[in-house]
């Protein structure tokens, strides 16, 4: 089913999570086909913000875009403005692409929409490649019928002496528009929403802020080096964001999983600005399987209670998952895990499923992992000595040699990330092709290339 969430948590009218309602299936695992999976009712005691997990980021983006479209149409039917708070970056990009499609194919009008963007680097020319102003125009504003006067984006060119007054006017403009009906948010590795870095106060308003080093490191690739990333930005404050009537935070990808866990299951602390969403009566977090992987209901579902109570069982997948988790937690080899280790870490139920206790579990998991290790990444040739040409080797290949395509984001990622596998495939007779997804020419500044060319020219003359 399109845009179908895997699992969701709901919130009461006062913003505190209610117990999750099971929708069938197995909790604590992700759907391979996009169907709904209900989490444990006990997860609501751990997750302090309502969370919905979709089978893919594209499904999640379409669902959020549909919600925005419904808000716009509802407001238009009452001759009212829909006031949206917007975010930038790769996370909401899919939402904007879907909104553009709805405008072009289904006639969704943005004539009654007023927008306020969360933030902008400072200083920043609005036409620069890294400008959020340019981003919004390229991905949304230039493709819809929104009125130019209804677009509000922090000005990265305002002089330092005028920044305070600009921020004050930005706050007043939001209030004059009637406040934000819906605020879209992303989350950074530091837990920032907007550019509200660790330490931001709950009642902070739109202001100039100094960026955290982690934030600047994460933006380095966009600026061709960390040293080129602006050190400051203008951002809506936490208080400004929490003043919106509804908040929707999106996070996709495994690199967001750890900070999502802190924001959703941890306490409200200024060091994780996103945790303040726990105090909002109508906030939600939208995730894909990768970004939800660290949540208790997915990573350690046994911590929520008996597995059978929420449709789970101790099958091979969950047994391996638990043993690996325990080994990593205790920093012990799997074969050295003891009955006491399992007992003391909430895995008594798993222990009781094996007559030999920890020994049986350890051997089972160790052997399953051992089978995945091979010196033949493309599979071994079949055994020509057998009448059927088959082999009893678990790594035997039905097709040998293979035609292999390696997709590499940049011209060096293939050898850096999988050089050993690459050379094994070639040495073992497979036909290997590499598809580079960018030429790499934009990864180097023009002046750096010219400087190197000048050096080579002078060197050759000598």
Regions inferred by a protein language model and the residue ranges of each:
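Short internal beta-strands
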Residues: 112-119, 251, 284-289, 434-437
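Active-site rim/loop-helix segments in enzyme catalytic domains that contact anionic ligands
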Residues: 342-462
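Residues at the starts of beta-strands that form the adenosine-phosphate
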Residues: 112-114, 150, 246, 282-284, ...
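SAM-dependent methyltransferases
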Residues: 2-48, 270, 274-348
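Glycine-rich phosphate-binding loop and adjoining beta1-alpha1-beta2 segment
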Residues: 112-114, 118-150, 442-462
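Conserved phosphate- and dinucleotide-binding cores of soluble alpha/beta proteins
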Residues: 55, 59-60, 73, 122-321
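N-terminal glycine-/serine-/threonine-rich phosphate-binding loop
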Residues: 2-8, 30-83, 379, 383, ...
